[in-house]
Every structure is written in structure tokens, then in C-alpha cells.
């Protein structure tokens, strides 16, 4: 099983002062590191969030955060998944009642994991994964 890591898990793994740093590391060491993935959206989110001057431990440098992520992605077991799911295709959704704009990115990531018959690992317990066909099965919540 391969786990597509949510940006918040990537951040927790790299930020020693993150509230979920130790839990994310424990999970990654025991399960996640065997086969894990990033994609353009999760990589972009990691770099965007951690390089913002408002992020508590930001270096303010996109280049530095790219280096941090590049080092993380050198850990064996990493895969890069290209973005190749379209949310405008009806077969992605479990109903015509689509999600709120705030959930679209994470639901896209769930759909990406579903397409590959893998898992989306996240800290977000409020994600309406039932809106994506196969979303419940693809969701892996970290036990935090």
C-alpha cells in the first residue's frame, strides 16, 4: 500500500515544533515510509505554507523549503504521482451533491489515491470523503 501524504503530514514530518511532529514521525517510521507519495499539489502546498513569513518557523525562503522537501523525498519508498484526475468528470463523484470550495483540494487528493487504488494519509478528520467514489476506502487517518 502506498500513502499519498497530505501537506500537513509533510509539514509535521519536517517541523520539529509542529503539534503532530512526534505522532507523524511514529506513523511514518512504522507504516508510511515503506511506500509513500507526493504529488504536485502536496509539494506546492508544503513549499507555499512553510515559506510564508506568517508560518511560525518560516525561513521566508522558497528555495530553502524546496531543499527541505527535496531531502525528505530522498527517503527510500518515495514515489511522485503526477496529477491526472479531473474533478469535472462525473465518475469521480459519488453524488451530484458536490463539496464546498474549501474541501476541493483534499477531495482531489482522495480521488488521486482512489484512481491508483492506494491511500490518502491525512490529519483532517472532517474531510467529506463520502463525496468521492471509493473515498472512504482510500482514507487513512493518522491515529492522533
Label for each model-derived stretch:
Residues 35, 77-79, 137-140:
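Conserved beta-strand segments of alpha/beta enzyme cores
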Residues 16, 40-44, 66-98:
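Acidic catalytic patch
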Residues 2, 86-99, 110-144:
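Acidic, PIN/NYN-like endoribonuclease modules and their adjacent C-terminal/linker elements
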Residues 1-38, 50-67, 132:
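Short, well-structured N-terminal submotif of metal-dependent ribonuclease cores
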Residues 7, 103-107, 124-125:
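Conserved glycosyltransferase catalytic-site signature
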Amino acid at each position: 500500500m502506498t500513502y499519498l501524504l497530505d501537506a500537513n503530514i509533510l509539514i509535521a514530518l519536517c517541523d520539529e515544533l509542529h503539534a503532530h511532529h512526534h505522532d507523524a514521525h511514529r506513523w511514518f517510521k512504522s507504516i508510511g515510509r515503506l511506500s509513500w507519495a507526493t504529488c504536485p499539489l502536496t509539494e506546492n502546498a508544503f513549499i507555499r505554507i512553510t515559506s510564508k513569513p506568517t508560518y511560525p518557523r518560516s525561513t521566508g525562503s522558497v528555495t530553502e523549503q524546496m531543499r527541505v522537501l527535496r531531502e525528505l523525498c530522498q527517503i527510500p519508498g518515495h514515489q511522485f504521482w503526477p496529477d491526472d484526475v479531473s474533478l469535472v468528470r462525473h465518475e469521480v463523484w459519488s453524488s451530484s451533491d458536490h463539496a464546498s470550495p474549501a474541501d476541493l483540494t483534499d477531495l482531489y487528493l482522495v480521488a488521486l489515491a482512489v484512481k491508483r487504488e492506494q491511500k490518502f494519509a491525512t490529519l483532517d478528520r472532517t474531510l467529506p470523503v463520502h463525496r468521492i467514489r471509493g473515498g472512504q476506502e482510500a482514507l487513512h487517518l493518522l491515529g492522533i
